[in-house]
A protein has these predicted regions:
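A mid-sequence interfacial segment
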Residues: 1, 12, 34-37, 77-81
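Compositionally biased, intrinsically disordered low-complexity segments
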Residues: 11-13, 28, 70, 78
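A short, structured beta-strand/loop element
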Residues: 22-52
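Negatively charged, low-complexity tracts enriched in Asp/Glu with abundant Ser/Thr
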Residues: 1-25
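Acidic, low-complexity intrinsically disordered segments
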Residues: 40-81
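Residue-level detector of functional hotspots within protein domains
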Residues: 3-5, 16-18, 30-32, 40, ...
Length: 81
């Protein structure tokens, strides 16, 4: 498993997101951990979609959809995809 950390702006604050690359028979996904605005740990996944894009799994926290493109950009920049 390969990992990297990226700081992403959420609202008015910067938060650290730790990305872990995982691969199985269904393909590649990234398991991501961070903390919410109350400093409670959260985790979620992004999976590869069409056109080499990355999408949140359905049912993710609503505020994550606002930074989905930044999360996808972080994966592309890491060159681990």
């Amino acid at each position: 498993m390969e990992r990297f950390v990226k700081e992403i702006e959420v609202g008015n604050e910067n938060r650290l997101f730790e990305f872990t690359r995982m691969e199985n028979v269904n393909g590649v996904k990234f398991f991501i951990t961070s903390k919410d605005e109350k400093k409670k740990p959260i985790s979620f996944s992004l999976v590869r979609a069409k056109d080499d894009n990355w999408k949140l799994n359905p049912g993710s926290l609503r505020w994550l959809y606002g930074i989905e493109s930044q999360l996808a950009d972080a994966i592309r920049e890491s060159r681990l995809n």
